[in-house]
Every structure is written in C-alpha cells, then in structure tokens.
C-alpha cells in the first residue's frame, strides 16, 4: 500500500495505522490528513501543514 495513502478524491481506501495520510483525499479515510486536523477535514488534503499536534490546523477554519 502507498505509505501516503494517495488515491483519487472520494474513492474508498483504507489507511494503515502508521500512515500519515499526507496525500489522502479519500472520503473513507479514518485518519486525519495531519495530526492536528479533525477527521473529515475536507481542506486538509489541500496542502495542510501543521506546526504541532496540539495546535489548531489553520486550513480547517
């Protein structure tokens, strides 16, 4: 499996527990695209960069 979980937007896919999902655009992905974004953040797949897990992700505003 691609370590970045990359696939077409909206396509069903699964992410491994160790996956960072940096490129994941799948609606079925159970993990956030980055550590400080909530699961389901639609903007997260659009180049979100987090400074830290405890900080709010600006792209999710």
Swiss-Prot record:
Residues 30-61 are annotated as: Alpha. Residues 1-29 are annotated as: Beta. The modification N-acetylmethionine is found at residue 1. Transmembrane segments: none annotated. One of its GO terms (molecular function) is zinc ion binding. A divalent metal cation 3 binds at residues 15, 19, 24, 29. A divalent metal cation 4 binds at residues 33-34, 44, 48. A divalent metal cation 6 binds at residues 37, 41, 44, 60. One of its GO terms (biological process) is negative regulation of growth. A divalent metal cation 1 binds at residues 5, 7, 21, 24. Gene3D superfamilies: Metallothionein Isoform II. The modification Phosphoserine is found at residue 58. A divalent metal cation 2 binds at residues 7, 13, 15, 26. A divalent metal cation 7 binds at residues 50, 57, 59-60. InterPro entries: Metalthion_dom_sf, Metalthion_dom_sf_vert, Metalthion_vert, Metalthion_vert_metal_BS. GO terms for cellular component: cytoplasm; nucleus. Keywords: Acetylation, Cadmium, Copper, Metal-binding, Metal-thiolate cluster, Phosphoprotein, Zinc. Monomer. Belongs to the metallothionein superfamily. Type 1 family. This is Metallothionein-1F. It comes from Homo sapiens (Human).
